[in-house]
Structures are given as C-alpha cells and as structure tokens.
Amino acid sequence: GHFMYDGSLFCNAIKNKTFESAIFFGPSGTGKTTLARLIAQEMDLDFFEINASTTGIKELKEILEKAKVKFFGLQKQKTYLYVDEFHKWNKLQQDSLLKALEEGVVRFIGSTTENPYFSVNNAILSRVRSIYEFKKLSTDDIVKILHNTLDNKERGLGNHSLVWQEEALHALADLSGGDARIALDT
C-alpha cells in the first residue's frame, strides 16, 4: 500500500509495537485481512479474528471479557481484535466495542469494503488512531503475487514443478480486476 514503505509511521508503529486501533477500507482482495494478521503476529498479543456477518454481540462480549481479564489481571496485556466486514454490524453492535476501546483493553482493526465515514459510527471513528484506504491491486502487483505463489516451496506451489506462460499470468491478473483472491482462486 501507499502507506507501507520502510520508515513510514505505519511501519514504524508495527516495528515498535505501538500500532493502535485503525480502520482498513477498500475493495475485496486487496490485503486488508492479510495485513491485520501480519500486524497481530508482529505485535505478539492475543489475537481474535471475527467476521461481523457471522458474529453477534454475545460472542463479542465473551472475547471482550477474556481481554479484560488479561488487561486488568497480572499480565496487563492488551488483546488484538480484528473485525472483518465491520460495516455489517449495526450501531448497537458497533457501540458494544466502545468501552473496551476507551479503557484500552483492546487494540482493534475493523475492515470494511464500505466508506467508513458512512458505515462506521462516529463514536468508533473518534477512537481509532487512523483510517487506511486500500486500492485495487495493479496487474503488476497481481502478477508478483502469482509468481510468489507459484515459486514459494513452503506456502505455495513451488514443490509441484509447474510450468506457466508469462502471458497467461498477465491475462489472469487482468481478468482479476485488482482482486488477488480472484487471481489466486482461478
């Protein structure tokens, strides 16, 4: 992303383990969830990942209770909470996060495909440190992702001795419409 370059405030906050709450917004397949997972890994905190379309207030409150025990207990440790599709929660559901954010119990990233200025409560927006916009990936970006997947022996297809034509990768990248998931799933 345009905010992810060496020495940026974004990268320094992750490196220094000071990354606070944020909203990620942009089209599907642009890396919002992947980046949230990488940040959580770097922050070395308990991590909960939920999807707003399948998780209700009851489950959220259970997570926040566990987080409070960690934060107010002996460990004094924050919990990292990632909520995918955050815009799918209504005002009441979004508001159920407020107290935990105010108390500093959780570090929170909400991701959304909707403009957060219209889909996220003002009370939540005022408590997150930053809002980051993700753009559709370029054809070149998608080709790099495809190459990485085809070449990576540990987490990709590198052990399968696959042969591909460069033109085919570019065509696939063009057809994906800037969505890495579509390119990888095709």
Task: List PLM regions with ranges.
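Structural recognition of the conserved hydrophobic beta-strand(s) that form the central parallel beta-sheet
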Residues: 50, 82, 107-113
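Walker A/P-loop
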Residues: 12-50, 65-68, 98-103
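Conserved AAA+ ATPase "sensor/coupling" helix adjacent to the nucleotide-binding pocket
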Residues: 127, 143-158
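Short glycine-rich substrate-engagement loop in P-loop NTPases that contacts/grips substrate
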Residues: 1-7, 45-80, 91
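The conserved phosphate-sensing helix
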Residues: 176-186
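Loop/turn-to-beta-strand initiation segments
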Residues: 20, 76-80, 103-109, 130
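Short regulatory helix/loop adjacent to the ATP-binding pocket of P-loop NTPases
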Residues: 98-101, 115-129, 146
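Conserved AAA+ ATPase "SRH/arginine-finger" region at the nucleotide-binding site
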Residues: 51-53, 129-143
